[in-house]
């Protein structure tokens, strides 16, 4: 690595340094080196502190100020990855990673990504790579079957599915479709009257989508939830909010119901919410980003009962279906509504297949024109493990979460704040564990203690957890979901929690 000497040109580079951008034999050789590097990383992943300990700006001090003029060998680059990049990673695939929701990895997911990148096709329409489009059609119907989605969401019905990069993309696209469908009825001059609904537990993606789509930010409703409903959205509160908006002359447009909220995995009552929405002509999108994967298991499928009343449904296999970033599945009942809002057809893309209306052009189902061949890695995951193994992987995570939950319940200093629905346990040090408790500020003191506990856990490097604040209460989130996590890691994580709790409580 070094500075960029502008006075030199390629003629001055020794012939031995000239390289091809794509050489099959070099790819084979260097590919083996990279795969070995990644395999070694996974074998040694527990040696690293889960949460990176670097300071902001650390990397600029490690790397040159400009790109290298001459080529460098992959061995040198991998050495720098090990020395400079790995220390700056938060190790999401560590078995001691219990933060956020995991982004599960798998051998099949890795290999599928290699194939996707290796082929490097851009499947914006059918003719640009027929296999990319048709495989996506097939795997989306496969997954629809696994989730027991109504036929109205399948290509074999009148619906269909598409792979996006994130839930945000899925919600933006469906909200645009809902917006345009409504404005065709009431006139574009009424854009400022449209209202979007969610709960105070709905992912912030909904608010971002509302802003992107051009809906007045004052018309975004984050309906308050309470502990009495498990922090789920109340159909009665939705009805009251919609009625109030109608009295103001506003137009209810879009509802996002969540199956497995980020904070606590609360379950919005889908069937009842869809019933209310139908009365007012509101588009219902179901966000099951995390928990949707679990619904391939029969024992969790009931959580999406009522989905037949929704207009669209999405979940992220990159969260809990071992597919790797990025992969978001979106199904819609009426693809033509989506396409009418997102379709462009410039002359350079015109072709007989598209004109025949016999094929899907996925450019009309998303924001961007270009798109990756995401279906390939999803196909590899589904085929390599099968439905039975994928269900088993999810059940193992849930079982380990139950183990952690049991350990928490056995220690009287702690309490479980909300019911565990999947593999997330929300817990905290109980107010009763504090010897000196000022009733006037008990909530503040308990929140402070739990905040200190989380900071201590994460600073240890032995585990990484995150927090949520629900109903004004600060809770720790232990999200079991990393592919490599085993029962022993659950026990070790709990030991870390107990040790730091003891040290903190001794000061109160």
Curated annotation (Swiss-Prot):
User: Which key words tag this protein in UniProt?
Assistant: Decarboxylase, Lyase, Pyridoxal phosphate
- Biological role: Bifunctional enzyme that catalyzes the decarboxylation of L-phenylalanine to produce 2-phenylethylamine, which is then oxidized to form 2-phenylacetaldehyde, a constituent of floral scent in petals. 2-phenylacetaldehyde is a precursor of 2-phenylethanol, another constituent of floral scent in petals.
By what name is this protein known? Phenylacetaldehyde synthase
**E.C. number:** 4.1.1.109
Binding locations of L-phenylalanine: 203, 318, 348
Q: Which cofactor does it need?
A: pyridoxal 5'-phosphate
Subunit: Homotetramer.
Q: Does the keyword Endoplasmic reticulum apply?
A: no
Query: Which cysteines link up through disulfide bonds?
Result: none
Please give an example of a GO cellular component term from this record.
cytoplasm
Q: Does the keyword Nucleotidyltransferase apply?
A: no
Family designation: Belongs to the group II decarboxylase family.
Q: Which GO terms describe its molecular function?
A: phenylacetaldehyde synthase activity; pyridoxal phosphate binding
Q: Matching Gene3D superfamilies, A to Z?
A: Aspartate Aminotransferase, domain 1, dopa decarboxylase, N-terminal domain, Type I PLP-dependent aspartate aminotransferase-like (Major domain)
Pfam entry (one): Pyridoxal_deC
Organism's domain of life? Eukaryota
Enzymatic class:
lyase
Show the catalytic activity.
L-phenylalanine + O2 + H2O + H(+) = 2-phenylacetaldehyde + H2O2 + NH4(+) + CO2
What PANTHER family does the annotation carry? Answer: GROUP II PYRIDOXAL-5-PHOSPHATE DECARBOXYLASE, TYROSINE DECARBOXYLASE
- Annotated PROSITE patterns: DDC_GAD_HDC_YDC
Residues modified as N6-(pyridoxal phosphate)lysine:
319
Q: Name one GO biological process term.
A: carboxylic acid metabolic process
